């Protein structure tokens, strides 16, 4: 019967209250499960459903596989809007619920569908229980829904990838002469046994109708249920079906036997029986019978899950009268049920695997479920347990068998099934579409779509075909006997395989283990598996056809990819040589010289026939030559005529590249390399001997020729961009930057001296200089600067803070003489993670001579710097940190002439000055790795002049006096504009020049301020000063409050 709208409304009202009662506990829920820790997932909510531990679900959760992103379909009675399904349930039926009356008019409410859905995908939220795939979504439709909506067809066209069916047709129950039910000694009804031939014949009789029904939207009535399942399977869904609860002697009925009429959908069909908690078939469960080849077992006895019940709002009876009065409410609850209807353990299991293997089809997921099941009863597939109990711990590690007809016992074989000889796996690459054009079409967005690994040992008579642009790593010891084809992407063998391997198109085989035979057909490659170097061992023949490619990666200490076979047939093809650029060389004083090395990259027992067409390094600085030596093929490495600076485009880059080119001087060292090329002991002894002989001796000690790590790292560059990235970081530009910054910032000393002289002469208030009547003064410095980078040099930022102190006095009536000192700290942040700090002490002498309105200030300063530098070197796999501490000095002389032209409105002073600055360091000696630099004592000078105008004006209001000083000037640099430092690598005597950002020939000087005298004791001041040019911008801001008391 159908529940009416009045009862549904009451349910919704109740559910709202029920949800509110849970809110506080759910909001406080914190997930105790941790990645990598299976036991941490077994909280109280987990343990309430014993089937979760029985199928080892915790191992999937510990690897973050929870069914997320997968949708489960359920065909059953109506699924209640239980809190366990909040935000994840979609119903495709008419929205009603199922209930019935007994002879006394008491109502019974149908919650079978709710219980089933909870087992598959109830939420994990700290309350009640949770399903196997607790992060999956659910789409439900009713088995018997006679409304206007065709929920079954909508389900077929939906995103649901696995559909649960916990229903079936019950056989008759035997009765005695009195018409009473006959009960068996175990307490079960005596069901009439289905007969295999009768069951299969029923399916076959309806085959044409089912075929027709499956090719169009499924109608209602007739054989529509079977047509629904067939159509869904043909649309790429996995059909999970309960076997039935009709005693162990019985077999599944016609709906579950559909693959006998349609063997092409068998791989999308999975029948499930019911286990008790001791791994015995429950006494109520139907056995596998003729469906054993597509059946697995799962926990199904006393399974705790979500349910609902009718309750009275008044506390009265739950019957027809109360229903008619609107006194009944649906209450969400939990309860235990038993039977093969608990099949959704497998349905949720499949959803977890669909997240784990997002690229697999439903048929392949079914194969993983079956072949990783734990065998029960008789060895192999049997009539009670089929493939065995599902095991999620093993299933998340990939298939354990590639199934063909030969792997199925004859008594259980479905004619026409398991006809595919190859397990075709498409690792599509991140973001690509899988199963395009079907209802289950989806975009592959997880990491497994680009790289995945299977660690199970795979057996069976089938083979493997790898397609798609991604990489599949096969880690187990595999004994499957079918062929292996690699047609796209990479198949990496970190385990062994007994079958023959063929690669074609854009396929790649990689690895360091054993295969049976090997043939590269065309456009294919062999290389390492991305985990170091090793030998791919071929027990029989290795064949390279024209158009194929053999990829070999080379490294130091004689390490390289290698192929060892009984025989090799080279029918052409290319050898592509690459260098291992993952080696971290900077921490080494020496690296083995690559150029001049010889590698054995192919070794055989019975000889090499033919030749490769060519050997192709993809590097401008390295070339290779093949050497065929009897049973072996070798590879020699030499340097090309191209120089490193041929890829450089700027002068700094060229200078560094030329210096690196000189680092190739070699010398023998006593270090030895252990060059082990032994084959695993499990291989045939004669092949092992062949490989060892080709290497001259296993664990042979060989003298290594030393090379400079930087030089060796440059050999692998392929583009100008790579070289520029390296030369910029190796150049040590930060030292030239600091020298330039010290010269530029010397202006703050001379500006302060001239401002103080103008202040003392009464020509400017100079509020940022605090002075007393005895000629003592102080000034706080704070400025920041920026140098704009160019193609040759990276930019940098500076900041300087400190204090200057001075004392001066009148000299006769028309002059002044003073002395100044101070401390400042300059910080410079360069490009590429370079930092410099300079602690600086200053000493200076200044004075002026006045001739009426004409003033001639002059002075000199001397500065001592203590410089600390730190810079990073990071390019490719190379990383290092270089540090240095050294001393430097800066001296300067300056002179100025200014004419005071004042009137009642404004004071003007045109001026001109000239300054000479000389910087000298005491030598640079970095500490670090191979990229550390050194430099001799060196100096540089600069001469600059400034022409400008100073102006200030003052006026008095009723309450305050305001002064507005300002300055505008044009600065001109003489001589060379480059600021460079000469450096060299520590193991070299060849110096190179590195330029900082050049100074601008011309620039502007700008100063502006305001002084507000609130009264004779309180003065507020604000000022800005800047030197602005195309390449450098220096700025300072000062603000002050003077309060005399």
From Swiss-Prot:
Recorded GO CC terms: extracellular region; outer membrane
Pro-piece positions: 646-1045
Predominant subcellular localization, coarse grouping: secreted
Domain (Autotransporter) ranges: 769-1045
InterPro entries (UniProt xref): Autotransporte_beta, Autotransporte_beta_dom_sf, Autotrns_rpt, OM_autotransptr_brl_dom, Pectin_lyase_fold/virulence, Peptidase_S8/S53_dom, Peptidase_S8/S53_dom_sf, Peptidase_S8_His-AS
Subcellular location, record wording: Secreted
Annotated keywords: Hydrolase, Protease, Secreted, Serine protease, Signal, Zymogen
A UniProt-annotated Pfam family: PATR
One of the record's GO molecular function terms: serine-type endopeptidase activity
Active site: 76, 112, 341
Range of residues in the leader sequence: 1-27
Keyword ATP-binding: no
EC number(s) on file: 3.4.21.-
GO BP annotations, alphabetical order: protein processing
SMART domains, per database record: Autotransporter
Residue ranges of every copy of the Peptidase S8 domain listed in the record: 49-396
Family assignment from sequence similarity: Belongs to the peptidase S8 family.
Protein name in the entry: Extracellular serine protease
